[in-house]
Curated annotation (Swiss-Prot):
Name this polypeptide is given: Callatostatin-1
Keyword Secreted: yes
Keyword annotations from UniProtKB, A to Z: Amidation, Cleavage on pair of basic residues, Neuropeptide, Secreted
Species this protein is from: Calliphora vomitoria
GO biological process, one term: neuropeptide signaling pathway
Principal location listed in the UniProt entry: secreted
Protein family per UniProt: Belongs to the allatostatin family.
Function comment: May act as a neurotransmitter or neuromodulator and play a role in the integration of information within the brain. May be involved in the control of visceral muscles due to its ability to behave as potent inhibitors of peristaltic movements. May also fulfill a neurohormonal role on muscles of the gut and heart.
Subcellular compartments: Secreted
Length: 16
């Protein structure tokens, strides 16, 4: 899921 990927990215600090 793209939303899950976005949450994952935010967790890494990409801040999508």
């Amino acid at each position: 899921d793209p939303l899950n990927e976005e949450r994952r990215a935010n967790r890494y600090g990409f801040g999508l």
